[in-house]
Amino acid sequence: MNVGVAHSEVNPNTRVMNSRGIWLAYIILVGLLHVVLLSIPFFSIPVVWTLTNVIHNLVMYVFLHTVKGTPFETPDQGKARLLTHWEQMDYGLQFTSSRKFLSISPIVLYLLASFYTKYDAAHFLINTASLLSVLLPKLPQFHGVRLFGINKY
């Protein structure tokens, strides 16, 4: 074990989702969020599933698609300061296993939420809007695109 030795990555954001156990931790955190929401007595099952989906997608959108730069003092801060975490992930390569996992997980959660809400129209619209808001920025066509100048700087 090398104590005090710096990591070899110039920008740790590029490889964080490929770390050991990160996918399992992600799934456990989503499950924990769902259990915490289930423990609130006045929420029905459909409301809990919709809230789990919406909170998950909101957190994913904020952390992957709005926060830019790196949380570390890195030599490449000049390059990474204008890129979101999603754009930095896997050095910008598309269709890597981490990107596929983070694209499929909201879809799976959406399908579960739709099933457990029994396809109720109000829940369905909320869950669909939430899914689209988090899936569209992940498309390769939106890499580096800032709609209406939002989050440009």
UniProtKB/Swiss-Prot annotation:
Entry function: Plays an essential role in the homeostatic regulation of sphingolipid de novo biosynthesis by modulating the activity of the serine palmitoyltransferase (SPT) in response to ceramide levels. When complexed to SPT, the binding of ceramides to its N-terminus stabilizes a conformation that block SPT substrate entry, hence preventing SPT catalytic activity. Through this mechanism, maintains ceramide levels at sufficient concentrations for the production of complex sphingolipids, but which prevents the accumulation of ceramides to levels that trigger apoptosis.
Positions on the Extracellular side per record topology: 127-153
Gene Ontology CC terms: endoplasmic reticulum; endoplasmic reticulum membrane; serine palmitoyltransferase complex
Membrane topology: Multi-pass membrane protein
Protein's cellular compartments: Endoplasmic reticulum membrane
Protein's UniProt name: ORM1-like protein 2
Subunit structure, interactors included: Ceramide-sensitive subunit of the serine palmitoyltransferase (SPT) complex, which is also composed of SPTLC1, SPTLC2/3 and SPTSSA/B.
Superkingdom of the organism of origin: Eukaryota
Transmembrane annotation, as ranges: 22-42, 43-63, 106-126
Keywords: Endoplasmic reticulum, Membrane, Transmembrane, Transmembrane helix
Record bears the keyword Endoplasmic reticulum: yes
Family: Belongs to the ORM family.
GO BP annotations listed: ceramide metabolic process; intracellular sphingolipid homeostasis; negative regulation of ceramide biosynthetic process; sphingolipid biosynthetic process
Cytoplasmic topological domain: 1-21, 64-105
Domain comment as written in the entry: Ceramides bind to ORMDL3 N-terminus and stabilize it in a conformation that physically restricts the accessibility of the substrates to their binding sites in the serine palmitoyltransferase (SPT) complex, hence inhibiting SPT catalytic activity. In the absence of ceramides, the N-terminus is flexible and permits substrate binding, thus liberating SPT from inhibition.
